[in-house]
Amino acid sequence: MADLFGGGHGGELMEALQPFYKSASTSASNPAFASSNDAFASAPNDLFSSSSYYNPHASLFPSHSTTSYPDIYSGSMTYPSSFGSDLQQPENYQSQFHYQNTITYTHQDNNTCMLNFIEPSQPGFMTQPGPSSGSVSKPAKLYRGVRQRHWGKWVAEIRLPRNRTRLWLGTFDTAEEAALAYDRAAFKLRGDSARLNFPALRYQTGSSPSDTGEYGPIQAAVDAKLEAILAEPKNQPGKTERTSRKRAKAAASSAEQPSAPQQHSGSGESDGSGSPTSDVMVQEMCQEPEMPWNENFMLGKCPSYEIDWASILS
């Protein structure tokens, strides 16, 4: 190193760099900056061995020492140097440590701000595992006769006990309103046997739920339908037709039953189960008249070509 600066080439290099050293020393008004320039002048090859800007990762390389100069954060600027630690001062270490901490905290704050600017709708957003606060949560409790539309409204319906059809009760903003409307309609149709969503509201007066409650009265059209259903007779047209058919079949069978015994009575007379006079007449007609026994007559009545009955009888 001495040969490099002490030789002929070293002298020429020092002479060439002398104007730059003078301009730097005259422009610096701070005494700390002037002392740093003296240290920088004592190491002329520092311009060739390292860059002239601050390297935030200079602390990762222990083989290089650092020289601090004033900056906007702590009043000093750090330049890497390849010389020993004889140029280091305690205040330079403190300023360098403060500057590195400032850079680290600033980087973390910038990352936090960037994460806050990213919205969940953007494609680069990564969802965290676990329950999210922005997701729409389903209701914890489902009510009888209540269902939700896809746009968020709630609908109440009740199944009629006779023809098993659904009666629409209305559209509501909340599930509780729809459940209460179902309870009113169910109590009107089924009375005390109705299964309600709010059994605790059954009902201090012993009648149907109060229509002047928190959620307002039932719609007039729905109430009219319920009254019409209650006013209908219990037997529906389909059931009356079935009962009339059954009655007609029973009457036809009862009309056919008396004619059957008459036919059996006629057949009974022919079988001999009738009156005694008829039995006697039948027996007389069936019996043949008795003829007196006569051997000659009998033998002559039955001639034979093999036997000469005339010679036998003579």
UniProtKB/Swiss-Prot annotation:
Where is this chain primarily localised? nucleus
Biological process (GO), any one: ethylene-activated signaling pathway
- Gene (UniProt): ERF055
Task: Write down what this protein is called.
Answer: Ethylene-responsive transcription factor ERF055
Summarizing the function annotation, the protein's role is: Probably acts as a transcriptional activator. Binds to the GCC-box pathogenesis-related promoter element. May be involved in the regulation of gene expression by stress factors and by components of stress signal transduction pathways.
Localization terms from the record: Nucleus
PANTHER family registered for this protein in UniProt = ETHYLENE-RESPONSIVE TRANSCRIPTION FACTOR ERF055, ETHYLENE-RESPONSIVE TRANSCRIPTION FACTOR ERF061
Could you say which protein family the record assigns here? Belongs to the AP2/ERF transcription factor family. ERF subfamily.
Q: Where is this region: Disordered?
A: 231-288
Recorded GO cellular component terms are: nucleus
Q: Which residues bind DNA?
A: 142-199
Example GO molecular function term?
transcription cis-regulatory region binding
